[in-house]
Amino acid sequence: MIMSKETLIKSIREIPDFPIPGILFYDVTTLFKDPWCLQELSNIMFEMYKDKGITKVVGIESRGFIMGPILATRLNAGFIPIRKPGKLPAEVIEESYDKEYGTDTVQIHKDALDENDVVLLHDDLLATGGTMKAACELVKKLKPKKVYVNFIIELKDLNGKSVFGDDVEVESVLTL
């Protein structure tokens, strides 16, 4: 698996100064367009969670919507979207969080989860952890049995894992 992870890392496109000057953007869409990379990513994540009893995979808009449903299918679980305000049609609950230049909000359907669910919360990249921390707090409001958090990539130098409590297992497929 070490060789496959190295191949996946080499397949990620790096875009300097995007979305603003000084930022190095890791473009995971290159993993999705390559059939081998997509399958390998799916296999690795499945192996990480196949014995955890996952009942729902929750993906964060928008790149969490790519691997989330694939993983949900493989785990025989449902898929639940977390979206920006105004995008979900039924009654929602929400969580707001601070960003570098203001605040943002994420929402989930109020009836998306219950106390019987074991949740895998997924997004593409862990940087500072703000968005996923808000998503995690949002999911916890619905009182599932357990919450796992997963990323494709973790930017280790930004120490995003530190925002999560000890009650949440946070794992990444790749660490940069």
Swiss-Prot record:
Write down the chemical reaction(s) this protein catalyses.
Answer: AMP + diphosphate = 5-phospho-alpha-D-ribose 1-diphosphate + adenine
The pathway is: Purine metabolism; AMP biosynthesis via salvage pathway; AMP from adenine: step 1/1
What are its GO cellular component terms? Answer: cytoplasm
Asked if the keyword Transferase belongs to this entry, the reply reads yes
Q: What is its EC number?
A: 2.4.2.7
Keywords, A to Z, come to: Cytoplasm, Glycosyltransferase, Purine salvage, Transferase
Q: Is Cytoplasm there in the keyword field?
A: yes
Coiled coil location: none
Q: Where in the cell is it found?
A: Cytoplasm
The record's comment on protein family reads: Belongs to the purine/pyrimidine phosphoribosyltransferase family.
Record text on subunit structure and interactions:
Homodimer.
User: What does the UniProt record say this protein does?
Assistant: Catalyzes a salvage reaction resulting in the formation of AMP, that is energically less costly than de novo synthesis.
Name of the protein in its database record: Adenine phosphoribosyltransferase
What high-level taxonomic lineage is stated for the organism? Bacteria, Pseudomonadati, Bacteroidota, Bacteroidia, Bacteroidales
Supply the gene name: apt
